[in-house]
Swiss-Prot record:
The gene is atpC. The keyword Metal-binding does not apply. It comes from the Bacteria. F-type ATPases have 2 components, CF(1) - the catalytic core - and CF(0) - the membrane proton channel. CF(1) has five subunits: alpha(3), beta(3), gamma(1), delta(1), epsilon(1). CF(0) has three main subunits: a, b and c. It comes from Mycoplasmopsis pulmonis (strain UAB CTIP) (Mycoplasma pulmonis). InterPro entries: ATP_synth_F1_dsu/esu, ATP_synth_F1_dsu/esu_N, ATPsynth_dsu/esu_N. This is ATP synthase epsilon chain. GO terms for cellular component: plasma membrane; proton-transporting ATP synthase complex.
């Protein structure tokens, strides 16, 4: 049996398929969710997310900008502000964002709300760059 995985962003449904396992990083660490998992509600960290579907040897790798996870016996719902498959990451754009944010943060005189917002943006960009440079092969659809 497989788990129905639904990933929703502000732009709509990002992913809605049956999967063998989805691996996420929660505040409590890495967890793998499969069909029959105990009910769970948790936050998801800015991290790498792995999806393994039947017929794929390798995991689909995603960059996720944090979110919420709600698991029932046969279904997992993830709500996130942003997620993208590894192969869809625009590396040049991410590098430009990284350089821009590093410059802004290094020139900040005080740690106000803008500083912390930019620091969070930088964590998200670093995650995208790390995932895009990861040598793990992810299958194309």
């Amino acid at each position: 049996m497989q788990l129905q995985l639904i990933i929703t962003t502000p732009n709509g449904i990002f992913f809605n398929e049956k999967v063998d396992i989805v691996t996420v990083v929660t505040a409590g660490g890495h967890i793998g969710i499969q069909y029959g998992h105990q009910p769970l509600i948790s936050t998801i960290e800015i991290s790498e997310l792995h999806i393994n579907t039947e017929g794929h040897k390798d995991y689909r790798i995603c960059s996720i900008n944090g979110g919420l996870l709600y698991v029932e016996k046969d279904k997992a719902n993830i709500i996130t502000g942003a997620i993208e498959f590894k192969e869809d990451i625009d590396i040049e754009k991410a590098r430009r964002e990284h350089d821009y944010l590093v410059e802004i943060l290094s020139n900040s005189k005080n740690k106000d709300s803008d500083y912390f917002r930019n620091e969070l943006k930088l964590k998200k960009v670093i995650n995208r760059l790390k995932i895009s440079s990861n040598s793990t092969q992810s299958p194309k659809k």
